[in-house]
Amino acid sequence: MKRTRRSLPANFDPVYPYDAPKPSTQPPFFNDRKGLTESSPGTLAVNISPPLTFSNLGAIKLSTGAGLILKEGKLEANIGPGLTTNQEGQITVEKDSDGLTFTSPLHKIENTVSLSIGEGLEDESGTLKVNFPSPPPPLLFSPPLAEAGGTVSLPLQESMQVTEGKLGVKPTTYSPPLQKTDQQVSLRVGPGLTVLNGQLQAVQPPATTYKEPLLETENSVSLKVGAGLAVQDGALVATPPNVTFSAPLEKNGNAVSVRVGAGLSIQGNALVATTSPTLTFAYPLIKNNNHITLSAGSGLRVSGGSLTVATGPGLSHINGTIAAVIGAGLKFENNAILAKLGNGLTIRDGAIEAVAPQPSFTPVTLWTGPDPNVNASINGTPVIRSFISLTRDSNLVTVNASFTGEGSYQSVSPTQSQFSLILEFNQFGQLMSTGNLNSTTTWGEKPWGNNTVQVQPSHTWKLCMPNREVYSTPAATLTSCGLNSIAHDGAPNRSIDCMLIINKLRGAATYTLTFRFLNFNKLSSSTVFKTDVLTFTYVGENQ
């Protein structure tokens, strides 16, 4: 007997035959198209779709959106002020409600809202329309105005300029020795010059008197020399006497000797007579009775039994040597007799000249005063109290500065952005108003005797400026800058960097000094912005 083969579904999987859900064979039986469903298999559940959903307790609830609300188990419209529902359940506007207000150009008259329109507008069949006027006639321009390519321009002469969109006259600049103070132009004069009755005149130096042996002749000073002295090639030298030697004396180099003949000899550096049956004496020896004498000629003499050189005025014997005798105003130097010069005298081209004394230099200090107010701005807001002094001594200018923050800059953090404080000066060394530390603050010269600020400009202010030839291009000095070091007792991670930038010019400035604060990320936390005293030096400007 053959066994009947069961038919299998088309998607039957003989390896995993348990994926397809099996219909429940247990009551109650249900139809999933009439509100019930099986979820999960073998479990009877209510078949719902949005806006129906289940609450956390498993109850069926209605999800509501904007404008709807459940009230006392009923779904209602969520209406606001000025709206209501009528007896038919329709949403209407309350007649006496002031929930809707209208402002000009809208107006409400009874149940009608209207729009007020002005000139250039019109209502055309319920549509707002703009009435465009007819185009105006083309513009004509007469000199000095000119039009080219739709642009109107104004030609300028050399004396005119446009600054920030405004027409003005170019400022007149003055080069040394001219200077401008207030509304006047003056001429700076140095030693030896003066201005008298509006005219530049030379100041005559005081008359110089000369004492012997100096002698003034016309515009030169000369030295009178006596016997034994002479001026050769502009130098004072001693002239030895013209000594001649006659036989038996003879000169060999620097030595004088006596030639001896018969009956004489030199023994032990002495002239002695030798035994001779007959002695004869030749000139300059002379026999007088039993004495033999030496006849000394010009320039020689016998003194104390010795033959010596006869010396005249200005010459003397010193240790067996003929030497010149010098008086006041002369000295020996390198085997020559020279004039002894005091202060204010020098030798030039062999002549003694008076030297004009060098002018003394008085140090100059420009500063903000000992305790300035908040005098520096960042982004237009005054927030930095800056103490700055510039001191010119000799050829160098020393910069001393310290800075304290106020307001939003009272403290800084590691994320603080870099910022700069800029001083800009004109050609006379006067502080301009174009920097963020400018001439509207206290600035001027410090007197020697007190701590005030003299704001009246002086020609010496230029000496405190950076030398434009040395710093023809911008130069910088970078130094570490401690913050609030006294309070933190020099703790680490409490310093930033400060860069002094010299002559980074902009605009009309002739000299600039820029203090740039950077590298705030070196701080470990927020810190009071109160810098240590910073010191810089640079080469000062010429007068």
From Swiss-Prot:
Pfam family, one: Adeno_knob
Cell compartment(s), UniProt: Virion; Host nucleus
Main location: virion
A GO-annotated cellular component: host cell nucleus
Bilayer-spanning residue ranges: none
Comment on protein domains: The tail region anchors the fiber to penton base capsomers, whereas the shaft, built from several repeated motifs, allows the knob to protrude from the virion.
Segments for region (Disordered): 1-36
Record-given protein name: Fiber protein
Anything else known: All late proteins expressed from the major late promoter are produced by alternative splicing and alternative polyadenylation of the same gene giving rise to non-overlapping ORFs. A leader sequence is present in the N-terminus of all these mRNAs and is recognized by the viral shutoff protein to provide expression although conventional translation via ribosome scanning from the cap has been shut off in the host cell.
Stimuli inducing this protein: Expressed in the late phase of the viral replicative cycle.
Oligomer status and interactors: Homotrimer. Interacts (via N-terminal tail region) with pentons.
Task of the protein: Forms spikes that protrude from each vertex of the icosahedral capsid. Interacts with host receptor to provide virion initial attachment to target cell. Fiber proteins are shed during virus entry, when virus is still at the cell surface.
Listed GO biological process terms: adhesion receptor-mediated virion attachment to host cell; cell adhesion; symbiont entry into host cell
Domain of life: Viruses
Family: Belongs to the adenoviridae fiber family.
